[in-house]
Amino acid sequence: GTVMLWYTPKEVTSSDGSTKTMYDMWIGGENGVLQTGTNASGMFAYLTNIEKLDLSKLDTTYITNMSKMFYMSSGLKSIDLSNFNTSNVTNMNGMFWGCSSLASLDLKTFNTSKVTDMNNMFAECSNITELDLSNFDTSNVTTMGNPYSYGYGGMFRNCKSLKKLNVSSFNTSKVKYMSNMFQGCSSLTSLDLSNFD
């Protein structure tokens, strides 16, 4: 099929006075919808000059791997995930890792019932102030933290602006790795972990 990409350029002035071109981007396909395969790992990684990403026309029904899907996309301020079908996804490791310009994420439509790996999922999302994950089904998750004695890990690691985090629905009965899960979340003042096993 055909992949279609629309974009709108705009000049942005940085705090140091320099300017650079940033883009808003929309993706679609024939009949308006673009169907993906099973592996979306790194699909939108390193989008440093894209501010807005509209994925409402992306059919994600068959994806099982969303690891690092938006990895280090530090320019992103907004992602439309309203039509994301995540019912077959097993791997969300590092999905939003390093999306340091995102101020918010609406994940209310996410079905995480098959996901086993959420390590680094929101790591270094340093601008996000609130995350409501009350709809997350984590009953099959085994990894939320660093499974190794070296390197980086932790589902919310260095989310330094995060003030509100709702993980009240988390089922951690199968989780083996939680180390560094909240490391560097220096703005969190309260956290309800009463359901954690």
Q: Which residues make up each language-model segment?
A:
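Negatively charged
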Residues: G1-D197
